[in-house]
């Protein structure tokens, strides 16, 4: 998945939003472009479990410059509730999960994720 997402950037994509495993995964900046490896499911039918990680349903909005370089973004955290659909996560668990996965899986991914969901590039020193 990581190789494919980077292949997409290498071949002209400005943003990659991955999907598939029904759970959130890490995010990263690669060559000044934003990659979200998976945002889980936003609205799941009754046949699929929405317990725990399977219920996390973030929406990530990103801003780029005219050349497609990532400027900043925001995670809008939602959690699915059976029979009710997605509801805003007021506990912070969704943002914390994405930050933890990003720190663990891609060593921070060149991004800083704040508690309020703001996503900014780590300044190069």
Residue ranges of model-derived segments:
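Conserved beta-sheet core of the metallophosphoesterase superfamily
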Residues: 1-58
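A short C-terminal boundary segment appended to hydrolase-like catalytic domains
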Residues: 51-125
């Amino acid at each position: 998945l990581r190789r494919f997402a980077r292949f997409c950037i290498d071949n002209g994509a400005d943003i990659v939003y991955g999907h598939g495993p029904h759970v959130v995964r890490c995010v990263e900046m690669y060559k000044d472009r934003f990659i979200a490896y998976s945002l889980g499911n936003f609205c799941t039918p009754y046949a699929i479990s929405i317990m725990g990680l399977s219920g996390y349903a973030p929406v990530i909005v990103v801003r780029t410059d005219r050349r497609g370089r990532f400027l900043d973004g925001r995670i809008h955290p939602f959690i699915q509730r059976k029979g009710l659909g997605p509801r805003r996560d007021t506990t912070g668990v969704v943002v914390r999960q994405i930050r933890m996965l990003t720190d663990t899986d891609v060593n921070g991914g060149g991004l800083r994720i704040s508690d309020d969901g703001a996503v900014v590039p780590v300044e190069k020193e």
